[in-house]
Amino acid sequence: ATQIGRTARVSLRVNPDVDAGTHPYISSGLKGNKIGVAHEVAVATYQRAAHLPGIEVVGIDCHIGSQITEIAPYLDALDRVLDLVEAIEATGVTLHHLDLGGGLGITYTDETPPAADVLIAQLLAKIDARGHGHREIVFEPGRSLVGNAGVLLTEVMFLKPGEQKNF
């Protein structure tokens, strides 16, 4: 970014270490999962990123899995992420947005996932109750929007080394 005279606005995905109660292959919110900066090092990672040239830290993201059929894991993850937001901002780094991901489930056989509006109402109530309603809030309800509507094509670009295995 600095080479072309720009500032890159970045948001880091953190791993809140929350069990979404979904299949292990589509779980992404537990400590041993492949996605996100570990909860224990998130504050230090944000501090480091905030001091890099050409970087403006603007938000925090998390994703706890896919095909989630309960609201409780989202609320648990939100509490943990808001705890991190407060710890990060206590160091002088301002976060403007909060991105909560995790694919709200769809019915394949006998699943009964909550409706997206019910989930969002509960998340917004918690965000407001904790004093974070002034932030831009992004929700990623995943397959509940597109589960029966398309195909995803991807390419692996990088591998992430983990404590117990590589992803």
Residues covered by each model-derived region:
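C-terminal active-site-proximal or functional interface alpha/beta core segments in diverse enzymes
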Residues: 66-167
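Conserved alpha/beta-domain cores
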Residues: 1-106, 112
